[in-house]
């Protein structure tokens, strides 16, 4: 099956929610307001790369970047039945291609092994956060 890649930001909310639920980032419960706004973080991102198979969203990633020094990867997700086919690696590669001289950052513990395999190095800096009201 051929995978097509796209950089449009206005991804369909329902397709994004289905993808996030498939990778267990959502318990499937969603209010109409949440669904209506599900793609807002993507629309406001610097870059979005999505993967499609036969018209179905099977993977995506978004990045925020200052266009020069730092870029941050968010929400890399690939449908379970499409994992281990190089789609996640290709999504990240396409992001890095847009800002090749930028320092790329990603905050994850669960997927650290994946990112190390594609060239990311552990960084001992401490990350702090204020939780989002949606989660």
Roles of regions detected by a PLM:
Residues 33-37, 90-94, 115:
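A generic local structural motif
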Residues 78, 84-97:
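Conserved acetyl-CoA-binding loop-helix of GNAT-fold acetyltransferases
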Residues 20-24, 75-80:
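Short, basic, glycine/proline-bearing loop/turn elements
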Residues 25-48:
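Active-site rim helix/loop that mediates acceptor-substrate recognition in acyltransferases
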């Amino acid at each position: 099956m051929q995978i097509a890649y796209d950089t449009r930001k206005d991804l369909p909310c329902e397709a994004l929610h289905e993808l996030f639920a498939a990778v267990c980032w959502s318990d499937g419960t969603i209010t109409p307001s949440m669904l209506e706004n599900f793609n807002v973080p993507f629309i406001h991102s610097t870059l979005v790369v999505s993967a499609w198979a036969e018209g179905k969203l099977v993977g995506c990633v978004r990045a925020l970047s200052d266009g020069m020094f730092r870029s941050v990867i968010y929400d890399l997700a690939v449908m379970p039945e499409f994992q281990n086919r190089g789609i996640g690696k290709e999504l990240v590669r396409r992001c890095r291609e847009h800002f090749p001289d930028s320092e790329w950052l990603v905050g994850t513990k669960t997927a650290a092994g994946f990112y190390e395999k594609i060239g990311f190095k552990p960084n001992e800096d401490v990350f702090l956060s204020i939780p989002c009201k949606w989660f």
